[in-house]
Amino acid sequence: APRPAPTRSRPPRMVAYRVPQPTKEEWIRSHGGLYGSRVLYLGQEIDDEEMNRVIAELLFLDAEEVANQYLYINSPGGSVIAGLALYDVMQHVGSPVITANIGMAASMASFILGAGVRGKRVALPNSRVMIHQPMGGSEGQAEDVRVEAEQIMKIKNTLVTMYAQMTGQTRERVIQDLGRDNYMSAQAALE
């Protein structure tokens, strides 16, 4: 019996993003087959480069088709400003972004977890969430330290308001919960 003709698989989709050297474009593979399933992965510290990667993928998938996107998270957190950029894009795109905690969603990563579609956020049974208030590390002249402290307080106020909206908790409860490193199981985070 004759053999069937071999089928060709589609090449993996690639997303362009600019790397730190401003004259070089680099193509990246989006975590294997996950990309074709509209799955994105945040699995490291939140910094400008990582957020630019996730944002580029989110925007590309949204431009390709308005449909559910899934953001899996296992991150220690990181830059508040970079995280807020991802939050803004998640709210901007037409595609619903469903978030899932698959390990640790700490600090800014917990905020991104909460930014997913309400009622569709997922935390695996052994995952953990940690929230706390934003931190700064200013050094130098007293005026510089004062200016940074004011900015941190403004960011804290913004985060408190947004956490309250995302979770349905009161501002007072959110302020209390952010007062220290607050580790929670998946079940405790749900409550």
Role assignments for model-derived ranges:
Residues P2-E191:
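Terminal-region recognition feature
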